């Protein structure tokens, strides 16, 4: 029997959080080995565990996978969260890339200089409500199904719902005009595996502040 996946990253959201969400939604238990010092990262690099000298890195099925999208693709394929054919996978990829675009803006917001933060927040809100959220609402409305692709839960739904939580952290009112997205968020959040992940004490990570992000950037190469 294969062991649990082992996630190597720092103790924060960053680029590992979407992987945590996907594993949790798939009902997969995982272990975490947190990188706490530059020496921890050096050890992984020196023993050849990090192909591009970068994290996230996930040990799974005898592999040491790096690159967030590659990790997500493997997990989604392994646990049947990646569509039934090439067309569905293309749609899932398209939607998750849109999720990643907006998610990246929110992820990096704490690093924004204080004198620019209000403008950056306003820009993110504008893009959320005028570009990204309407697009996903339109997809759901176009086919009237419960999930984005093939009327079946996929990584696109999981990653979108993760993003919706971040959008609400930024401003709870941003979802007000998107009833289908709110319904999707409720639907996915009530899945037993996701519901468990959303409970206090799970491996889900809290929002990151600028201090924590900068500290991690000191020894995590881009």
Curated annotation (Swiss-Prot):
<feature type="region of interest" description="Disordered">
    <location>
        <begin position="199"/>
        <end position="222"/>
    </location>
</feature>
<feature type="domain" description="GST C-terminal">
    <location>
        <begin position="85"/>
        <end position="208"/>
    </location>
</feature>
<feature type="compositionally biased region" description="Basic and acidic residues">
    <location>
        <begin position="206"/>
        <end position="222"/>
    </location>
</feature>
<comment type="function">
    <text>Glutathione S-transferase that catalyzes the nucleophilic attack of the sulfur atom of glutathione on the electrophilic groups of a wide range of exogenous and endogenous compounds. Involved in the formation of glutathione conjugates of both prostaglandin A2 (PGA2) and prostaglandin J2 (PGJ2). It also catalyzes the isomerization of D5-androstene-3,17-dione (AD) into D4-androstene-3,17-dione and may therefore play an important role in hormone biosynthesis.</text>
</comment>
<dbReference type="GO" id="GO:0006805">
    <property type="term" value="P:xenobiotic metabolic process"/>
</dbReference>
<dbReference type="InterPro" id="IPR050213">
    <property type="entry name" value="GST_superfamily"/>
</dbReference>
<feature type="modified residue" description="N-acetylalanine; in Glutathione S-transferase alpha M14, N-terminally processed">
    <location>
        <position position="2"/>
    </location>
</feature>
<feature type="modified residue" description="N6-succinyllysine">
    <location>
        <position position="4"/>
    </location>
</feature>
<dbReference type="GO" id="GO:0005829">
    <property type="term" value="C:cytosol"/>
</dbReference>
<keyword id="KW-0007">Acetylation</keyword>
<feature type="modified residue" description="N-acetylmethionine">
    <location>
        <position position="1"/>
    </location>
</feature>
<dbReference type="InterPro" id="IPR036249">
    <property type="entry name" value="Thioredoxin-like_sf"/>
</dbReference>
<dbReference type="InterPro" id="IPR036282">
    <property type="entry name" value="Glutathione-S-Trfase_C_sf"/>
</dbReference>
<comment type="similarity">
    <text>Belongs to the GST superfamily. Alpha family.</text>
</comment>
<comment type="subunit">
    <text>Homodimer or heterodimer of GSTA1 and GSTA2.</text>
</comment>
<dbReference type="GO" id="GO:0006749">
    <property type="term" value="P:glutathione metabolic process"/>
</dbReference>
<feature type="binding site">
    <location>
        <position position="9"/>
    </location>
    <ligand>
        <name>glutathione</name>
    </ligand>
</feature>
<keyword id="KW-0963">Cytoplasm</keyword>
<dbReference type="GO" id="GO:0004364">
    <property type="term" value="F:glutathione transferase activity"/>
</dbReference>
<dbReference type="InterPro" id="IPR004045">
    <property type="entry name" value="Glutathione_S-Trfase_N"/>
</dbReference>
<dbReference type="InterPro" id="IPR010987">
    <property type="entry name" value="Glutathione-S-Trfase_C-like"/>
</dbReference>
<feature type="binding site">
    <location>
        <begin position="67"/>
        <end position="68"/>
    </location>
    <ligand>
        <name>glutathione</name>
    </ligand>
</feature>
<feature type="binding site">
    <location>
        <begin position="54"/>
        <end position="55"/>
    </location>
    <ligand>
        <name>glutathione</name>
    </ligand>
</feature>
<dbReference type="Pfam" id="PF02798">
    <property type="entry name" value="GST_N"/>
</dbReference>
<dbReference type="Pfam" id="PF00043">
    <property type="entry name" value="GST_C"/>
</dbReference>
<protein>
    <recommendedName>
        <fullName>Glutathione S-transferase alpha M14</fullName>
        <ecNumber>2.5.1.18</ecNumber>
    </recommendedName>
</protein>
<feature type="domain" description="GST N-terminal">
    <location>
        <begin position="3"/>
        <end position="83"/>
    </location>
</feature>
<keyword id="KW-0808">Transferase</keyword>
<dbReference type="InterPro" id="IPR003080">
    <property type="entry name" value="GST_alpha"/>
</dbReference>
<dbReference type="InterPro" id="IPR004046">
    <property type="entry name" value="GST_C"/>
</dbReference>
